[in-house]
Amino acid sequence: MPSAVATVVGMNDMTTLHDAIGDFPRRKAQTLRFSCGAPRSATAIGDGSRVLFLRSDGPEDLVTSLWLSVFDADGTHREVLLADPRVLLADADDEDVPAEEKARRERAREGGSGIVSYSVDAAGRRVVFTINGQLFLTEIAEDGSGRTRMLAADGIAAGEGATPVLNPRISPDGRHVAYTTGEHLMLVDIAPQWPSGSRHDDATDDDCDGQLPPHAHGHRCGDEESGAPYDPSADKLSTLWSVYPDDDADENTWKIGLAEFVAGEEMDRYDGFWWGPDSRHIIFETFNAAPEPMWYISDPANPQTPASGRRYARALTSNADVRLTLAELAYDGHDEYAGLGIQQISWNRKDYEYVAAVHWSADHEPLLLVQNRRQTRDQVLSVHLGSEASAGSAPVGSTTVLEEHANDQWLDIIQGTPAFTPDGRLVCALNDMDADTNRLTVDGRPFTPAGWQVREVLDVTDEDVLAVVQRTPELDGYEAPDGLSPWRGNADGHDARSFDVVSFDYDGNVLPMTARPGSWSASRRGEGLVVSGRDMDSAKSVMSHSFTMRPVDGGAVPENDGDGSAAMSTLVCPIDNHAAEPGFAPNVRFARLGEHRLYTAIIAPSADSPYAKADRLPVLLKPYGGPGFQQVVFNQAYYWDAQWWADQGFLVVTADGRGTTGRGPRWDREIFENMKDVTLADQVEAVHALAQAVEELNRGTAQDGDASRIPAPDLDKVCMIGWSYGGFLSALAVLDAPDVVKAACAGAPPTDWTLYDTHYTERYLGLDPAAYERNSIIADAPKLARPLMLIHGFADDNVTIAHSLRLSQALMAAGRPHTFLPLTGITHMTNDPVVAENLLTLQRDFLRDALDL
């Protein structure tokens, strides 16, 4: 089972472990949590011998570039810089990001700059992305080199309504790019000839402003019909479709091509339009946010700045009105846009208002996953594309129900499902309550084994499904066939704490793609696989490109000399990581605590800490503790903050209670309509079981001088810190369990669940207002008898500062002293490096004073 004792790692300029840990807050802030310089966002392309990825130049460089990992025909591996934002734009370091793009990045928790996302065509030859609102195209040559230019630069700059450029997606054939401005869905026809200069200016008509009548089909700015001659080196910009810009004089509540707020925040669906595999069809979303309440985010430190208003899907109120439209594009002889036909996609929107997923694979009709408001029922729908004139055929845009699912509490969304296999079988997710397993089905038949919790589907073929899974060993009845032993006897380390990439065939056989327990994901194409993630052994994230190379002209295939992270591949090469390291490995032990056998991490002071040989230490509980997210995982980065806290003189404990996923659908649903009581009870259970667990971990170690010995917990001095749900749990602990938790720091706590969004909150609390009253903590304010610090950002549009303000107001009304740190300009991500650094020390000093340390 992975564990670690704190040691000095990778810090040539620091001679002691104590120095490295002491400098951690500053270095964490400077390096964007040690992520700068690390490769990320990998996509295998072509035959799998190539992988696209993003990476900045160094440990403090926020500007990410586009790179290519290449295996040449002789097996040589190279990394090729395809597009550098600083070369393409002089002001790449000074980002001017549109408000809509900032919102998308906030939903995706994106903290970088430069090229932060990209779209690639089916052949892996063309890639599009934005930098500072400008649209760029990179073409990849046979030798792996690339050339990059702006697309439709003058047309986008000059056309009214053509900006901002949001979510550009290249067509599968690589000839067109669609993007949205929020009000217009735009199309760029890529010139077949590369312009002579690095920047190409698109010709436009002076009288063409890019505007369209509401919901009228588009036309080209500067097209041939207006007299402009065809130019094979000129990109053409067209408006495909627009939403109503004049519904409201002050606010356009209609949006096109964007995902509504709850889709991005809670469903992990960030796209609002989808190309068809034939590059002639597009499904696009339009939504009207007018039914949602209007909320305002203000900046009190700058009273001259007006408050920013936006619609917010508040729990127990109305959602946005979401619609889908199918567009069929026509092209002329030059493969340039010549018009379109559209048809609304019809389904039972009244009963199934959430569009959870859209998936469209080659040679098949598009698939939709729609949910009812309570998320207790869903439908998998196919969208009909055929001609209305065909005898007996269903109308274009109509849908057919392929599968339906139900659950008394809620249904989980498993990313990557539903999906067709190439030969037409339907792969769906199943919350199998009888087997207590989140499984996959093919044409309605479960085929993944019991005890293997599927978290995400990465790829679907006729032979297998590539997926991210967590094992529940106590449920796992799977017996590997002869010659196939998952993890070769290392299965005990692969449990709820490990996110493993495996291949399932449709008979339920399992082939692991990752060898070490950790937090892994992957992308697969052809004979290539790129695996990325973290484990407990390395401070840096790992990205490994593997490719099965066939012998050429009788030559031998090189032997696999990799680390086993992609066991079935022949060639394996790591992708360089230029990130900084914190300079220490955390001193963490893992245990199972209490009646519920809670997965728990216990982090003790490092060997250099003055507290290393203490007999006993105060306890710092550091949970998330809420539904849908785990913190006790085999990922070293999860424990760096905890190690800093341990070296301040605390025994740090993180326990994953009921609802935190990874242990089956029953475990997840034990919090239903009772999050408050259940999640707090599990933290209290962990405290009560802690002393015995530490005794057992120390059994066999010397009492003095042994670095592996853990100081005993001082259960009279227990405190808690947390952010988001962890902040809620921290405030709740000093309100409802003051005999156990004696002080708390609560960051961005959702104190009143009626102020949080629909999709998340109603999944766990349902639609009964009484459940919200029971699970909120405002009414508990008069019970406060322990020190409490509230921390909240004014710019937080996810958990708004109203949560902390309402609790503070109730505490004031009850005469209960407390501390409140309002953060100007800070969102839910705490993205200011100075604030992030100082928050740690301010919380430390508060807790030391509160516990009289």
What is the meaning of each model-derived region?
Residues 2-511, 517-518, 824:
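Beta-propeller folds
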Residues 41, 63, 116-117, 128, ...:
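Non-catalytic accessory segments flanking enzyme active sites
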Residues 250-252, 572-710, 715-729, 736, ...:
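Cap/lid segment of the alpha/beta-hydrolase catalytic domain
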Residues 682, 742-743, 748-786:
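Mobile cap/lid helix-loop segments that gate and shape the active-site cleft of serine hydrolases
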Residues 732-742:
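Conserved hydrolase catalytic core segment
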Residues 784, 790-792, 796:
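Short beta-strand/loop motif that positions the catalytic acidic residue
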Residues 798-806:
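Conserved alpha/beta-hydrolase "acid-adjacent" motif
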Residues 805, 812-853:
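C-terminal catalytic histidine-bearing segment of alpha/beta-hydrolase fold enzymes
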